[in-house]
From Swiss-Prot:
GO terms for molecular function: neuropeptide hormone activity. It comes from Metacarcinus magister. Its main location: secreted. Belongs to the arthropod CHH/MIH/GIH/VIH hormone family. Disulfide bonds join 42-79, 59-75, 62-88. Keywords: Disulfide bond, Hormone, Neuropeptide, Secreted, Signal. Transmembrane segments: none annotated. The keyword Disulfide bond applies. Residues 1-35 form the signal peptide. This is Molt-inhibiting hormone.
């Protein structure tokens, strides 16, 4: 027969294990959903995450300059292949990097429909 202390310890351990499993499952589902959204925008993202981060940084800077949270989303639309991205390049004064940025956007968007 189990004592009261052993029973309480067993239930606490079961509860803790349940919470750890639920947290792990939630984390995995969030990561998959985030990756799916990013992959839908840029089909050639796998293996090019460093390029994506460099190009995305322009959109984040642009959003911070104008204090408009929707600006970053517009800038990233169609895997950075849009007028808003070009506008952000000019707004962040990175026109000297334009040829490099076009090359990176081309790599990220390769296979785009």
């Amino acid at each position: 027969m189990m004592s009261r202390t052993e029973s309480r310890y067993s239930s606490q351990r079961t509860w803790l294990l349940s919470m750890v499993v639920l947290a792990a499952l939630w984390s995995i589902s969030v990561q998959r959903a985030t990756a799916r959204v990013i992959n839908d925008d840029c089909p050639n993202l796998i293996g090019n995450r460093d390029l994506y981060k460099r190009v995305e940084w322009i959109c984040e800077d642009c959003s911070n300059i104008f204090r408009n949270t929707g600006m970053a989303t517009l800038c990233r639309k169609n895997c950075f292949f849009n007028e808003d991205f070009l506008w952000c390049v000019y707004a962040t004064e990175r026109t000297e990097e334009m040829s490099q940025l076009r090359q990176w956007v081309g790599i990220l968007g390769a296979g785009r429909e």
